[in-house]
Amino acid sequence: MRSAIIDIGYNAIRAVVYECDRLGAPEIFNDKFKSDIINLLNLDDLEVKHQVYLSLQYFVHIFDRLSVTDVKCVATAVLRGHPRAEEFREIVKRKFNINIEIISGNREAYLTAAGLISGINDACGIAADLGGGSLELAQIKDKKVGILKSLPLGTSLITNNHFDDINIISQMINKEFGEVYSNHSGIQQCQQGYHCPNLYLIGGALRLIGRSYMEFVHYPLKNLHNLEINRREFELYLEKLAHAHSMRTQYKSRIHSNAILVAKSMLNVFLPEKVIISNYGLKEGVRFACLPKEEQEKDIIYERTKTLVNFDETTYNIKNYTEVIKPILIQPDTTTISIITLVIMLAQYNKNIDKTLRSNFIVEFILASDIPFSHRQRLMLSIALALTYTTRSDTYINRLAKRMINSYDYCNSHIIGNFIKIAREIDGPRFQSPSFSLELKDNRYIEISTLNILPKAVFEKVCERLKAIGFARKIFIEIK
């Protein structure tokens, strides 16, 4: 059953269609149009030909062609409290049979936070969604949403309300959200601010700043979602962005000066350790809230990957293979363990691909995929998956990884990739049950025991992979 979400915002109308009501279902349509809905609402007669109606008509046409059975439409600050909002709703209902739900500011903040949680499973900190008509703030921790606040600090409203001063904006954020956040979280305000762990930037205006930052620093990956920036580095960049008129980036002319003001104000008030950009926000939150409870509790990365490769959990025994590799990993954390699972799943994604090009294909896919991997996961997966198809890891990815992830992750990625190759050589492509075990001797040697004696050719391949694992561990020890 295909479902669609429409988000009517201050500056744009967005729509997305999902294949079904599972968390791992892929998007099969995603588009947006600029919207001057304020101009429409200011007309004497709302029943005129207008781009807003043409956009909605187009979406309805696409929904019909895709056999969409359920449409959820929400409108935010652009209609919230507007005297002609009800008249507009009635026209849209009559013309397109779409029911527009005009959500409150707090509801918008909640749904934005829910969307963030669906896309970043371990999100912790403050979600900030900046639109044309408002700024929504939400506290997030342990997949739960805490304090919610909607402030009249949208990029289009700041100038109209004469709020275009960093001190005014900072004071408003602190008074309306910061003080409540301090009381609720137990984090006491110091002279500088509150020191929240992460500040998640959502909304087109803030994402554009993130994209511009990536270009400015020549960030090697292209994925905006889950981009992590040190607070101090981001502060310095915002200063350059605000004052350096000669700065050359393709996004500079499109960045709203009020978005820079709001971003700087939030950094002043919350003092986050990191700034993280998220592509997941209101639309995703509306969908997430409509999903069954059991779907909401799942991990979107695992579910999206499972759907991609048509992974049958009853056929594979990933847990047992994970136990086999654990003794040879170097201080693995939960992310490292999750990489093992994802590599085994993605290693099945090789049908109808030239076997001599599988390594190139899978690396490029991981780097380009819209599955919401963290950048750390993308690099670890790329190294490990390249090794499952070739005897050497991808040179380009190796160079990136050495710059962007720590030595633990770099070495563990090599260990995982070579281990998966060993498992395939011994047990075949389906990881049903391990017929071998590994033991680390004196923290130097790796001993393998197999259920059956291996043919010489297979044994030699396994030994080469064990040597590669030993070399990765040796390099790590030398680095340390």
Language model features: what each stretch is:
Residues H82-R89, I260, C463:
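Short, surface-exposed alpha-helical segments at coil->helix boundaries
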Residues P327-Q331, R399-K480:
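Divalent metal-dependent phosphate-bond-processing catalytic cores, especially two-metal-ion Mg2+/Mn2+ enzymes
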Residues V17, I38-I62, G81-H82, N99-S118, ...:
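Helical "lid/coupling" subdomains associated with nucleotide-phosphate turnover
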Residues I28, G146-L148:
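A structural motif specific to WD40 beta-propellers
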